[in-house]
């Protein structure tokens, strides 16, 4: 099964929405590796800070079907798609990498995501997938993060709260 790497973000009741999104991913896909959660300033507009994380899943879904499933999850969390592109979000989940695929499709599907140039995607992704390769840059996620101008910024780590016994609130159960 392919591995998909996801970027998760929220700045409206973010702890609840991210926790519930991670739970939904685990319910649908089983084991999910999740990065720590970090606080980042909004990009592209003046808004509340976002909480962002990355997740890795093994999926039986095509990129198009996975994108549709993620949109349904966002919608279930009250995602409003009628506003400007850069705006507050209850939940924003994007497929940033899907194995070594390069693709575009309906529903704003772009793999790899252009947002891979931003710290809010690269930092958490480098934590869980340092060796994953950007299919267009021919560099690893770790290399891209080390070269990023915000690499040395100390972004605040945020805990999502209670988790099942034997797990961390923001990490998958031990293997």
Which residue stretches match the model-derived regions?
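Short, surface-exposed acidic-centric catalytic microdomains
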Residues: 20-63
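Extreme N-terminal starter segment of soluble prokaryotic enzymes
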Residues: 1-5
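Flexible, gly/pro- and Lys/Arg-enriched active-site loops
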Residues: 43-50, 67, 72-175
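Short beta-strand-to-loop capping motifs
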Residues: 8-10, 55-61, 97-100
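N-terminal structural module
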Residues: 9, 15, 24-25
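Short, conserved charged micro-motifs
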Residues: 15-17, 61-67, 104-105
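Hydrophobic pocket-lining residues within nucleotide cofactor-binding pockets
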Residues: 12, 38, 103
């Amino acid at each position: 099964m392919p591995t998909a790497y996801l970027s998760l973000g929220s700045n409206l009741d973010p702890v609840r929405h991210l926790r519930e999104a991670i739970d939904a991913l685990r319910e649908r896909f089983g084991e999910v590796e999740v990065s720590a959660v970090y606080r980042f300033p909004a990009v592209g507009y003046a808004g509340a800070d976002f909480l962002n994380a990355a997740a890795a899943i093994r999926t039986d879904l095509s990129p198009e079907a996975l994108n549709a499933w993620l949109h349904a999850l966002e919608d279930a969390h009250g995602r409003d798609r009628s506003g400007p592109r850069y705006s507050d979000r209850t939940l924003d989940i994007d497929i940033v990498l899907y194995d070594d695929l390069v693709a575009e499709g309906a529903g704003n599907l772009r793999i790899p995501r252009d947002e891979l140039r931003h710290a809010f995607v690269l930092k958490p992704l480098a934590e869980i997938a340092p060796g994953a390769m950007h299919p267009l840059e021919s560099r690893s996620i770790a290399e891209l993060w080390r070269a990023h101008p915000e690499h040395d910024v100390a972004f605040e780590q945020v805990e999502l709260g209670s988790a099942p016994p034997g797990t961390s609130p923001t990490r998958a159960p031990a293997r």
